[in-house]
């Protein structure tokens, strides 16, 4: 088996990040049910989804190379926040992130027909205090809509971040170092 993989993701960020790793890949999207189970912990949730996306790729017939699935959630007060469903939801989220530190959890999974291997990377991100105006203007930029927690650290949302501890790449959607390590372990095992 060569180093080439499949990327089971619709995310343009994950495509860019995987390109940055120099791994040859083919991208396709999978349609996974992303709802959280009752009482499911954020860590378990994000890891389950990454595995589900990878295994859905295998189930679609992409079986000749490892399939990479990944998922990102923002966690504050033990609650997982996905993409905002509307401006109200977004405003509520940004007010919770404002002036606080939250965690971004990104899970990565590789799957083939006979095995699946995954890991979760946690990064702490601290936001400055945001005004109502800043929050409203940011929503109108169109950037928050498709991003976990309603912000993009790599875009206009970057100016809200006063401190980050951990993997910047994991916040954007794919931790470079950990993904490469996981693939090496997967291919060896
Ligand atoms: C917090 C944060 C999230 N994000 C993105 C990463 C993920 O693409 C997205 C979270 O949604 P995900 O459901 O993890 O991924 P996705 O729907 O974009 O792609 P797919 O499921 O097909 O792989 O939020 C940023 O781009 N920047 C950030 O700062």
Swiss-Prot record:
Organism name: Pseudoalteromonas translucida (strain TAC 125)
Protein name from the UniProt record: dTTP/UTP pyrophosphatase
Record-annotated site: Important for substrate specificity: 13, 72, 154
Main location: cytoplasm
Localization per Swiss-Prot or TrEMBL: Cytoplasm
Entry similarity comment: Belongs to the Maf family. YhdE subfamily.
Keywords assigned: Cytoplasm, Hydrolase, Nucleotide metabolism
Active site: 71 (proton acceptor)
An annotated GO BP: nucleotide metabolic process
Superkingdom of the source species: Bacteria
Catalysed reaction, written as an equation: dTTP + H2O = dTMP + diphosphate + H(+); UTP + H2O = UMP + diphosphate + H(+)
């Amino acid at each position: 088996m060569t180093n080439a993989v499949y990327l089971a993701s619709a995310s343009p960020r994950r495509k860019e990040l995987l390109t940055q790793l120099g791994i040859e890949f083919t991208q396709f999207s999978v349609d996974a049910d992303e709802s959280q189970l009752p009482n499911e912990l954020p860590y378990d949730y994000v890891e389950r989804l990454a595995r589900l996306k990878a295994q859905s790729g295998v189930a679609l017939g992409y079986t000749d190379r490892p399939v990479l699935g990944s998922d990102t959630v923002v966690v504050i007060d033990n609650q997982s926040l996905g993409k905002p469903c509307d401006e109200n939801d977004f405003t509520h989220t940004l007010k919770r992130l404002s002036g606080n530190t939250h965690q971004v959890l990104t899970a990565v999974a590789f799957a083939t027909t006979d095995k699946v291997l995954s890991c979760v990377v946690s990064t702490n991100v601290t936001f400055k205090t945001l005004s109502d105006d800043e929050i409203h203007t940011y929503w109108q930029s169109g950037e928050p809509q498709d991003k976990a927690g309603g912000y993009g650290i790599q875009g206009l949302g970057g100016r809200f971040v006063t401190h980050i501890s951990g993997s910047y790449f994991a916040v954007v959607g794919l931790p470079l170092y950990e993904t490469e390590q996981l693939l090496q372990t997967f291919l060896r095992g």
